[in-house]
Amino acid sequence: MENKTEVTQFILLGLTNDSELQVPLFITFPFIYIITLVGNLGIIVLIFWDSCLHNPMYFFLSNLSLVDFCYSSAVTPIVMAGFLIEDKVISYNACAAQMYIFVAFATVENYLLASMAYDRYAAVCKPLHYTTTMTTTVCARLAIGSYLCGFLNASIHTGDTFSLSFCKSNEVHHFFCDIPAVMVLSCSDRHISELVLIYVVSFNIFIALLVILISYTFIFITILKMHSASVYQKPLSTCASHFIAVGIFYGTIIFMYLQPSSSHSMDTDKMAPVFYTMVIPMLNPLVYSLRNKEVKSAFKKVVEKAKLSVGWSV
């Protein structure tokens, strides 16, 4: 990547300059991050430890937890550090690295959500063919494809953004190096770069959402065809909670990325990324895993084993 700029560092202005909000936010964000770490890493360890959870659904869940942990960790610690130190300077290369990591794992999540929706479609709508449809090879290809798309997409957007010249202001009106917030600082013509951003993001979201919407449409139809209310009530509730989480993720990303930078009000737009960088990674373990009986059963086994170990040691 060729550095065509005179700017060697950026200044992150943070989420807010309101002194009254500094303490509440400083308390809230570490709390959210701790829940995110415990929830996502706990799910990964639990799925790895319990052989009963070694199936396609939990394979994708463990990858989703890993992705949530990675892209949340690329942003949240820097936000928390910003509350402690006045100097919120980030180097040019560190800014590019943060953008790359965040975009890569956010894109991976985009395609993992589509893979998970297809997996649920196969399980609910084609249960007799589920084991032959979602084979180990198919799951591995879907996961690897998600990661490849993520890293390719991150390369496109990071290269596209940092190929611009930054020769004026270096103050990023954001709490991390998000693409629109950095791109708006460019003193060169960014029209082509904005079109690349909009078209590539639109393509990624369209493909994933198409798979998700088609899968869940067939799932809802299949569930509603079930004659017993007690049978379809639980899967309907589960699918609804999944759909809400997916809606928040895509709604905030569409709001941020599918508009030209001239339409952005950075003070307003800082709130949407809070959801997809901090809130969604915290909620996903609760929505997708911790409400599941198999996960709860595996967790109880771990607790009972820990109690026995403590008992023997005493």
Curated annotation (Swiss-Prot):
Protein's cellular compartments: Cell membrane
Residues the record marks as carrying a glycan: N3, N17, N153
Disulfides per UniProt: C95-C187
GO molecular function: G protein-coupled receptor activity; odorant binding; olfactory receptor activity
Chief localisation class: membrane
Bilayer disposition of the protein: Multi-pass membrane protein
Highest taxon above the source species: Eukaryota
One cellular-component annotation, GO: plasma membrane
Keyword terms of this UniProt record: Cell membrane, Disulfide bond, G-protein coupled receptor, Glycoprotein, Membrane, Olfaction, Receptor, Sensory transduction, Transducer, Transmembrane, Transmembrane helix
Regions of this protein lying in the Cytoplasmic compartment: 45-52, 119-131, 216-235, 291-314
Function: Odorant receptor.
The name this protein goes by in its record: Olfactory receptor 5B3
UniProt organism field: Homo sapiens
Record lineage: Eukaryota, Metazoa, Chordata, Craniata, Vertebrata
Gene: OR5B3
